[in-house]
Amino acid sequence: MTTTLQQRSGASSWQAFCEWVTSTNNRLYVGWFGVLMIPTLLAATICFVIAFVAAPPVDIDGIREPVAGSLIYGNNIISGAVVPSSNAIGLHFYPIWEAASLDEWLYNGGPFQLVVFHFLIGIYAYMGREWELSYRLGMRPWICVAYSAPVAAASAVFLVYPFGQGSFSDAMPLGISGTFNYMLVFQAEHNILMHPFHMLGVAGVFGGSLFSAMHGSLVTSSLVRETTETESQNYGYKFGQEEETYNIVAAHGYFGRLIFQYASFNNSRSLHFFLAAWPVVGIWFTALGVSTMAFNLNGFNFNQSILDGQGRVLNTWADVLNRAGLGMEVMHERNAHNFPLDLAAAESTPVALQAPAIG
């Protein structure tokens, strides 16, 4: 009898925990994905803060020339970063227990892998949690689809690009100036500005900003008057009210006359789908572009493609980018013994004109 009661008590405790995890009445929804998300994001955040403040220099290039990224080694908020793991580690999984000592783990940039892997698992779980909450509330699943764009971008720079280049030392550093350094080196090595997928991403981000500003200003300019001149117009809206808070016909008429009729949406649902889809698709393409350039399928090369009648080069924007890229690549590779091959290449001397006969 006692055993039966203990089993029922244990079962009821587990059932109560399951109900709490999946309850939509909590102030913050946890969900089963949240059970994974919370510890991984906490681990990533704690390790990032400690490493950003106090991590010792990291031998990022694997040539015994450590690079300092933390605040106590002289950096500030702009220049500081969690430096990627060493090129000597490559793509090896490098948890603390794989190092001979904690000092070795820090010297080889172990905190970077800890932060990035926990962060990626955390944002994947956050995306799953968005779907899970939508499912519980009977909503459509497009919120997590929209969130997949920044998730894809993070996966591209932290996971796919290092895989393609053969080392986590090529991943994006976790800092402001480190991000800009990553962008400059990426342009130098892959000519990303001449890649059509990057162009689509620029159109997605800038276009999304433009459309967001246009939509917000149109709605704000066509609000239905509910207040006096001495009151804030925001008091004219009550949360959950059934009436439209702005006149979509007036907004449609204004914009249709400003541009042309069919440039303006007359359907609120299709309008908001467009506002969501435009930047999401653009960022998807950028992530796809970074993922393909990770394997050196680079941007278009139009260098020295225009010549005059006497065969002299007429420099174009492509040539300007190419010269800038060469300069950035020289600055990136600071050591003569690690000089960029496309800059150090000279005319080769053949060792043998034909293969020797065998036998």
Curated annotation (Swiss-Prot):
Binding positions (a quinone): H215, S264, F265
Catalysis: reaction(s): 2 a plastoquinone + 4 hnu + 2 H2O = 2 a plastoquinol + O2
Residues binding [CaMn4O5] cluster, per UniProt: D170, E189, H332, E333, D342, A344
Tree of life domain: Bacteria
Regions that span the bilayer: 29-46, 118-133, 142-156, 197-218, 274-288
Pfam family for this entry, one: Photo_RC
Post-translational events: Tyr-161 forms a radical intermediate that is referred to as redox-active TyrZ, YZ or Y-Z.
Cited HAMAP family: PSII_PsbA_D1
Record's protein name: Photosystem II protein D1 1
Lineage: Bacteria, Bacillati, Cyanobacteriota, Cyanophyceae, Synechococcales
